[in-house]
């Protein structure tokens, strides 16, 4: 644990010193717009991504939409509760049946604010609502629109498996005065400038900065470890998410805390990801004594892809939400693809364990 703390601190200092004098990793320009969630070719240019919070308790064995989400976020926002997942899709039209829809979390909206996401939730706490109000964001909330956009198999007034879909969401956007298209007024300064420079006789397609710095090809830093076969992110005593590397597909397959496959109820497929990002972040208990606030300025972490592991330092980026630095303090890009991102805090004793195919630990670190 001390080694990880020293390593993260050294890397963070190197990154901070180098940020001002070393250019960020350059991404090759392309005529085709890229998806801000995956770094791949955008199939829905000009559309707002959709972010849906879903239940992830141990008893949540029925989850819809996992296997087709471009990005999945996970963090413990209440020390005495289970984590929720945030499934992110590139557009309303890309949203399959998804659920069970859970309470909104301002942490997820903070992470995704640069991508102009459309939040979908089932109610939310005071911090969630305050964040939405402060930034004038309108969520599609099951407690507001009810059966106009959400369905369930039990009595609506109980705690059912509420779920929705892109078609259902599209049917209520007009009545909620929500646009599914990107808005120039909400673009970041960098994105607005880029859009202005590319203006021609035809109006340019609006775009937003990517969440992660990603590339389809290019040199990567040397991996810190190979044969990273199994991953366990422990959020609490009975609250964990695991992954096992599948060489045939080149992805990390998602596991429940008990080691069983985490399946998508839409197609019975196990959720799999090209990239795993486990980012360590300092956290503190908020004034309500119930919820955690995370420091999103910088920290350490690991990246896994293709059965390899890299240690990294992360900070806020200029061309993307996150910027990553290798063990030598040099900026680098992740490979394009679907990603799982977990924020791990030391406040509740959360930890990460990575083992090779022989079961030998490659890392066993508590969050700094």
Could you describe each region identified by the protein language model?
Residues 22-25:
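Bacterial signal peptide processing site
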Residues 28-73, 79-368:
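A surface/extracellular/periplasmic glyco- and lipid-processing/surface-interacting theme
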């Amino acid at each position: 644990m001390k080694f990880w703390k020293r390593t993260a601190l050294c890397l963070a200092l190197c990154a901070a010193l180098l940020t001002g004098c070393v250019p960020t990793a350059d991404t090759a320009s392309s005529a085709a717009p890229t998806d801000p969630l995956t770094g791949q070719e955008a199939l829905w240019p000009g559309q707002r991504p959709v972010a849906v919070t879903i239940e992830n308790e141990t008893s949540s064995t029925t989850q819809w939409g996992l296997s087709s989400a471009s990005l999945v976020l996970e963090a413990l926002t209440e020390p005495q509760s289970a984590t929720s997942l945030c499934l992110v899709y590139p557009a309303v039209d890309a949203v399959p049946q998804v659920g069970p829809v859970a309470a909104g979390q301002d942490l997820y909206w903070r992470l995704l604010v640069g991508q102009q996401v459309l939040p979908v939730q089932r109610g939310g706490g005071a911090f969630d609502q305050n964040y939405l109000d402060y930034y004038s964001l309108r969520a599609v909330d099951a407690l507001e629109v009810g059966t106009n956009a959400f369905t369930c198999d039990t009595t609506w007034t109980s705690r059912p498996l509420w779920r929705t879909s892109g078609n259902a969401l599209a049917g209520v956007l007009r009545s909620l005065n929500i646009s599914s298209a990107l808005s120039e007024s909400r673009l970041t300064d960098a994105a607005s400038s880029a859009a202005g420079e590319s203006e021609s006789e035809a109006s340019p397609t609006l775009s937003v900065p990517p969440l992660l710095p990603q590339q389809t090809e290019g040199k990567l830093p040397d991996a810190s470890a190979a044969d990273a076969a199994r991953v366990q992110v422990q959020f609490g005593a009975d609250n964990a998410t695991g992954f096992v590397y599948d060489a045939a597909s080149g992805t990390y397959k998602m596991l429940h805390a008990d080691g069983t496959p985490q399946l998508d109820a839409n197609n019975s497929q196990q959720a799999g990801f090209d990239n795993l990002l486990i980012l360590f972040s300092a956290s503190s208990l908020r004034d309500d004594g119930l919820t955690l606030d995370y420091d999103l300025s910088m920290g350490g972490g690991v990246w896994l892809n293709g059965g390899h592991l890299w240690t990294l330092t992360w900070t806020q980026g200029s061309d993307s939400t996150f910027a990553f630095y290798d063990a030598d303090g040099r900026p680098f890009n992740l490979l394009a693809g679907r990603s799982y991102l977990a924020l791990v805090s030391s406040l509740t004793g959360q930890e990460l364990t990575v083992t090779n195919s022989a079961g030998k630990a490659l890392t066993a670190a508590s969050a700094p």
